[in-house]
Amino acid sequence: MVGHYLWLAILYGAASIYSGRSGLEVLRHYGPAYLTAVGTMSSAATLAVALDCAHQSKNLRSDMVDFGIPLFANIHLCGSVLTEVFFVMTVSQVLYGTLPGVGPMVLFCLLLGIFAIGAPGVPGGTVMASLGLISGVLLFGDEGLALMLAVFALQDSFGTACNVTGDGALTLMLTGYAEKHHIRAENVQNVEL
């Protein structure tokens, strides 16, 4: 969890610098989304609450919220990825007595970043999508995969909360980008078919 909070601090700091707006103003609205994510362990199930929290911020453009939050809920799984990288190293040390080599870890991290984009926003989605990587790249046996699933499930709620809360920072960056490039706000009306 400490890693999650450090990552969120870096992410919101970078978003504040890039956009020229306060990331703390965005972050202060994310309490309900964070708690919902902890309870559901699902970015998809937390989406409605996250949208509501993001719309409360004065620093986020409404059109960027409507575009960014649903997109990032599906492709931005930083908390899950951070946790999984830490856990593969821990499980490797515990079961096999050594950490994975630098080469396999670099390859694993690169591929995990790609796999995480396609992982479903459901409980355990990231680790389930990456089991092939864990066994194929890091050469974990069945006992290593089983331990990864068990340990990951115990903390998945906090990874999901980091994912959802980080979406606010990315949307702040998106707002900053739109303003720097003079992209005007679009008001989309409901269309009846």
Model region roles, listed by residue range:
Residues 6-7, 46, 83, 166:
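Residue-level signal for transmembrane alpha-helical positions in Major Facilitator Superfamily
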Residues 16-17, 50-60, 171-177:
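Helix-loop junctions at the membrane interface of multi-pass solute transporters
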Residues 36-116, 184-191:
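Helix-loop-helix junctions within the multi-pass membrane cores of secondary transporters/permeases
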Residues 22-38, 62-70, 142-149:
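The feature identifies polytopic integral membrane transport proteins across all domains of life
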Residues 1, 34, 71-79, 154, ...:
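Loop-to-transmembrane-helix entry motif
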Residues 14, 18, 22-23:
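Transmembrane helical segments that form the transport core of multi-pass membrane transport proteins
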Residues 1-13:
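Entry/N-cap segments of selected transmembrane alpha helices
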Residues 85-193:
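Transmembrane alpha-helical segments and their short flanking loops
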